[in-house]
């Protein structure tokens, strides 16, 4: 059980005790009234029965009735005063406890009505006073006793007036405390509403901060991912640059080899022309010698030496031709490799352009601004002299 429930139960218990005391005071008043009525009836019976000592008996009965009325009135006043005193204090304590804790409920209107009715019931009845006065005036035979009774009645009136005044003040105090309780309760409810609103706003703010933190974490992850992609792109870009440099170097070497092949081909053509001229001159000399007739041994020996030298030159030319063919084959393979490098380079550039955030322009200029040699044709037909073997070929 929480503190709030315990305090509420204690307040209810105190209220029940106050009601119980009110009922006890009321029962005491009713008992006193019954005694007064019973004694009044006894007095009337005695008055109706005349005896030798009527005056004395009437005085004694009157004194007894007055004394009993005074005692009962004082007892009722004391009990009522105690109950009235205890009731406001207890109610005040209940209200204070309820206001201080801001948790107790205000007393119901029915309880207040019951308390007021009990307070009214606790008062000495006016009819009893009138009956007492009537009995005193009708039965008293002595003016002194009558004056005493009047003084006692006046005292009772004064006590009742004081008690009524005190009860009125206590009721006003209860009303003031009830109003203060209602005001404080309204303020407490308003404070609880504001506190609830603040709690809701704090919860919403915490939820927003958690979502913002999650969003920041996602952004950081994306940034790390983008940084990784950027690093990957930089690596690829560097790799492309290195490959481009290698391709340029390879292209440069191919151009140098092509230049050397062109020079070798030109030298070969010049030597071939020289060989043809020498062949023609040798054929011409052979015809002149055959037309003259017999030749001397020296001329025959010279011709043989000439033929041997020509055959040696033809073999040398054939060897150079073979070397040239091999060079052409290597050149063709190099051109195929160069074309494959160009294709691979274009694929890498296309992959780079497809990456998100890449530039739309090409990073490197196209180095393939020269014509690829698709066909090399070399005609080396050597059939212009005896013993020569023609070996035509084409690339």
From Swiss-Prot:
Species lineage: Eukaryota, Fungi, Dikarya, Ascomycota, Taphrinomycotina
Can you say what this protein is called?
Uncharacterized protein C713.09
User: Has keyword Metal-binding?
Assistant: no
Q: What ranges does the record list as Low complexity composition bias? A: 134-143
Which keywords fit this entry according to its UniProt record? Coiled coil, Cytoplasm
User: Coiled-coil stretches, from where to where?
Assistant: 224-351
Any one Gene Ontology cellular component term annotated for this protein: cytosol
The compartments listed are: Cytoplasm
Q: What species does this protein belong to?
A: Schizosaccharomyces pombe (strain 972 / ATCC 24843) (Fission yeast)
What are the start and end residues of every segment in region (Disordered)? 17-155, 276-304
- This protein's record includes keyword Coiled coil: yes
């Amino acid at each position: 059980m929480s503190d709030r429930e315990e305090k509420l139960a204690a307040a209810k218990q105190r209220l029940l005790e106050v009601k119980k005391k009110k009922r006890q005071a009321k029962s005491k008043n009713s008992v006193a009234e019954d005694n007064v009525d019973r004694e009044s009836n006894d007095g009337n019976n005695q008055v109706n029965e005349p005896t030798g000592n009527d005056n004395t008996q009437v005085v004694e009965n009157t004194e007894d009735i007055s004394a009993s009325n005074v005692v009962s009135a004082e007892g009722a006043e004391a009990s009522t005063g105690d109950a009235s005193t205890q009731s406001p204090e207890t109610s005040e304590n209940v209200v204070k406890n309820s206001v201080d804790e801001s948790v107790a409920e205000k007393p119901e209107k029915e309880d207040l009505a019951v308390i007021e009715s009990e307070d009214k019931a606790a008062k000495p009845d006016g009819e009893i006073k009138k009956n007492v006065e009537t009995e005193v005036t009708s039965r008293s035979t002595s003016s002194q006793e009558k004056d005493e009774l009047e003084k006692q009645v006046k005292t009772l009136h004064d006590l009742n007036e004081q008690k009524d005044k005190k009860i009125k003040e206590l009721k006003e105090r209860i009303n003031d405390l009830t109003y203060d309780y209602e005001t404080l309760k309204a303020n407490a409810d308003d404070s609880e509403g504001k506190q609830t609103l603040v709690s809701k706003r704090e919860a919403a703010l915490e939820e927003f901060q958690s979502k913002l933190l999650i969003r920041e974490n996602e952004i950081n992850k994306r940034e790390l991912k983008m940084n990784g992609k950027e690093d990957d792109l930089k690596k690829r870009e560097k790799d492309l640059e290195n490959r481009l440099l290698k391709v340029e170097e390879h292209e440069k070497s191919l151009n140098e080899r092509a230049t050397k092949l062109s020079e070798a081909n030109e030298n070969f053509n010049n030597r071939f022309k020289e060989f043809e001229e020498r062949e023609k001159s040798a054929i011409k000399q052979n015809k002149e010698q055959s037309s003259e007739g017999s030749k001397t041994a020296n001329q025959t020996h010279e011709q043989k030496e000439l033929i041997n030298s020509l055959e040696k030159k033809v073999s040398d030319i054939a060897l150079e031709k073979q070397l040239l063919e091999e060079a052409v084959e290597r050149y063709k393979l190099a051109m195929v490799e160069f074309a494959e490098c160009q294709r691979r380079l274009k694929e890498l550039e296309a992959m780079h352009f497809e990456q998100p955030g890449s530039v739309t322009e090409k990073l490197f200029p196209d180095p393939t601004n020269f014509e690829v040699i698709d066909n090399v044709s070399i005609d080396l037909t050597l059939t212009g002299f005896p013993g020569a073997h023609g070996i035509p070929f084409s690339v």
